[in-house]
From Swiss-Prot:
Protein's organism: Salmonella dublin (strain CT_02021853)
Protein's recorded name: Large ribosomal subunit protein uL6
SS bonds (residue pairs): none
Single annotated GO MF: rRNA binding
GO CC, alphabetical: cytosolic large ribosomal subunit
InterPro entries: Ribosomal_uL6-like, Ribosomal_uL6-like_a/b-dom_sf, Ribosomal_uL6_a/b-dom, Ribosomal_uL6_bac-type, Ribosomal_uL6_CS
Record keywords, A-Z: Ribonucleoprotein, Ribosomal protein, RNA-binding, rRNA-binding
Gene3D superfamilies for this protein: Ribosomal protein L6, alpha-beta domain
Cited PANTHER family: 60S/50S RIBOSOMAL PROTEIN L6/L9, LARGE RIBOSOMAL SUBUNIT PROTEIN UL6M
Pfam families for the chain: Ribosomal_L6
Family (UniProt): Belongs to the universal ribosomal protein uL6 family.
RNA-binding listed as a keyword: yes
Gene, per the UniProt record: rplF
Lineage per the UniProt record: Bacteria, Pseudomonadati, Pseudomonadota, Gammaproteobacteria, Enterobacterales
């Protein structure tokens, strides 16, 4: 039995929750997020809280309820506070710039890399070697950060590449003669 699903998600003031069958819509100051939940999950909205439980006839009901609780908690946090993800560019000549909703990267290729940001995600560059992504949808922010990192992953000898700000890159020792 999932212990995660037993804790309710507190809905703060200023957040509007609509439940239409298995489709949940959460609206706040940072935008509106919608998610379709698994059929095994039953969601109730009462007393400024969302409670979760399994439906009868589903073997994985508690597990799905725990997953649904975690996803909706992230949605509530996203529409109230938002999420940020920081990336660092390590390497000589590696630079980033933001123009509108396009991130321009110089990563040592013979051409510049232009990455189009999806709707709801904003980027800024405090320095040329740093990118800060902001948005309400945690999953989309993580995917955009992973896409940017995939252009030039940190290599294991010098650690050059695009890395998350909190990422520790393990470096190998060079080959000895």
């Amino acid at each position: 039995m999932s212990r995660v699903a037993k804790a309710p998600v507190v809905v703060p003031a200023g957040v509007d929750v609509k439940i239409n069958g298995q489709v949940i819509t959460i609206k706040g100051k940072n935008g509106e997020l919608t998610r379709t939940l698994n059929d095994a999950v039953e969601v109730k909205h009462a007393d400024n809280a969302l409670t979760f439980g399994p439906r009868d006839g589903y073997a994985d009901g508690w597990a799905q309820a725990g997953t649904a609780r975690a996803l909706l908690n992230s949605m509530v946090i996203g529409v109230t506070e938002g999420f940020t993800k920081k990336l660092q560019l390590v390497g000589v000549g590696y630079r980033a710039a933001v123009k509108g909703n396009v991130v321009n990267l110089s990563l040592g290729f013979s051409h510049p890399v232009d990455h189009q940001l999806p709707a709801g995600i904003t980027a800024e560059c405090p320095t040329q070697a740093e990118i800060v992504l902001k948005g309400a949808d945690k999953q989309v922010i993580g995917q955009v950060a992973a896409d940017l990192r995939a252009y030039r992953r940190p290599e294991p000898y010098k650690g050059k590449g695009v890395r998350y700000a909190d990422e520790v890159v393990r470096t190998k020792e060079a080959k000895k003669k």
